[in-house]
Amino acid sequence: MTNWINTVSRDHVERGVRGRFTQANHGKPHMLRKMSRGDWIVFYSPKTAYPDGEPLQAFTAIGQVADDEPYQVEVAPDFQPWRRNVDFLDCAETPIRPLLDDLEFIEDKARWGYKFRFGVFRIDDHDLEVIRSAMVTPTAHIAGT
């Protein structure tokens, strides 16, 4: 299994949680094709809304990829994004700053936001566990069950 971070504004994350899906890189399929069923995906939201929301800098959702291939949907005639289904866990929005020292994927703690410019990227098991334990309560279950 692979662990991923997807950088997405909170309003878009909330839509995905309600619909039990994720998109990446403004609906492009490339990174979604690299994901496999069972992969963990953590959502980091730099802002509350895209494009002009307030700064947030928090992890806003976590779940596992629940399908085998990306699929395309029509949101509007000129926008047909690619998606993956996700089984989301119940979790608490978690500010990133208290976790910075423990996250190994952030090599330069002074410029910690740089990595998120890539949109979607892999993290190791240690970093997933740091984030998951901060976000998920002991009684967490798959959202919507």
Swiss-Prot record:
SUPFAM superfamilies: PUA domain-like
Signal peptide boundaries: none
Top-level taxon: Bacteria
CDD domains xref list: EVE-like
Entry-linked InterPro entries: EVE_domain, PUA-like_sf, UPF0310
Transmembrane segments: none
Gene3D superfamilies, alphabetized: ph1033 like domains (3.10.590.10)
Record-stated family: Belongs to the UPF0310 family.
Entry protein name: UPF0310 protein Mvan_0064
Organism field: Mycolicibacterium vanbaalenii (strain DSM 7251 / JCM 13017 / BCRC 16820 / KCTC 9966 / NRRL B-24157 / PYR-1) (Mycobacterium vanbaalenii)
Taxonomic lineage: Bacteria, Bacillati, Actinomycetota, Actinomycetes, Mycobacteriales
